[in-house]
């Protein structure tokens, strides 16, 4: 993020413009004659000077094409790996790096080849080598955050294909390391209020575990085995424009089946759902905020459950 400060100094007929990067805490000060600022014909000149800020901020760099693009991105990843970054900085930098990786064809393959051939641990594929390097540099949570925040809007685009390729590589890496579903959900959560049932998050979670049922169970356990939290998250996701109705209905039915298999009669299910709305359960499990179920939502859920339980 760039912040600009503009100060007029009439006594010496000068204008001072300071641009500051929130990423690096670096600042560039520009001094212009006041007449140049007042004359809009000089806008291009002033804008060119202000673009010197790009040297301070990675996401403003003009990335080259061809071999130079590969070299530039490798240099960026290696530089990020050499410096000590706090969690917030890692989140920002990995998102920018991820966007560049999926921006052009075969960047993933070329950069993966570099890390595959580099001294160090052996890898089976180029993609595995790149995924390992990204996780080492930005952490599991950083990589998970990049996946959740960089999915291209057009699922048929080349970028979407590249994003899918990277996600598969990370999921395969985590499986190979023996990560449990709890590990994966905790990485995706990253301490924030995450919509686990959003298409990007849920699809990636399923890639990392064995099935949709395993993904649902991992989310349920993350919510402290609280059905109120679980149903609230599902219903909230259903309101989104990009909601996947099939997946969400299946996730809702999974929760119903859990109680039906325990032989919970409908009245007991209703009382259980209401009980988990109490403050005693609000602080258990995951700390992220959620909206409690409304009375009408509880009534609808109970009605749906009664149809399943009676079958």
Curated annotation (Swiss-Prot):
What are the boundaries of the signal sequence? 1-15
GO BP annotations of the record are: effector-mediated perturbation of host process by symbiont
Residue ranges for motif RxLR-dEER? 48-62
Instruction: List keywords of the entry alphabetically.
Output: Host cytoplasm, Repeat, Secreted, Signal, Virulence
Any one Gene Ontology cellular component term annotated for this protein: host cell cytoplasm
Query: Could you tell me where this protein is found in the cell?
Result: Secreted; Host cytoplasm
A Pfam family matched by this chain, by name? ATR1_WY-dom
Q: Where is this region: WY domain 2?
A: 210-311
What quaternary arrangement does the UniProt entry report?
A: Monomer. Interacts with defense protein RPP1 from several ecotypes including RPP1-NdA, RPP1-WsB, RPP1-EstA and RPP1-ZdrA, via their leucine-rich repeats (LLRs).
| Further remarks about this protein from its record | The ATR1 effector protein of Hyaloperonospora arabidopsidis is a polymorphic member of the RXLR class of secreted effectors. The ATR1 alleles are differentially recognized by RPP1 genes from different Arabidopsis ecotypes (Niederzenz, Wassilewskija, Estland and Zdarec).
Q: Which family does it belong to?
A: Belongs to the RxLR effector family.
Domain remark in the UniProt entry:
The RxLR-dEER motif acts to carry the protein into the host cell cytoplasm through binding to cell surface phosphatidylinositol-3-phosphate (PIP). However ATR1 does not bind to PIPs, even though it harbors the RxLR-dEER motif at the N-terminus, suggesting that the RxLR-dEER motif is insufficient for PIP binding. The tandem repeated WY domains are involved in the recognition of the RPP1 defense proteins of the different Arabidopsis thaliana ecotypes.
Protein name, per record = Avirulence protein ATR1
Q: What species was this sequence derived from?
A: Hyaloperonospora arabidopsidis (strain Emoy2)
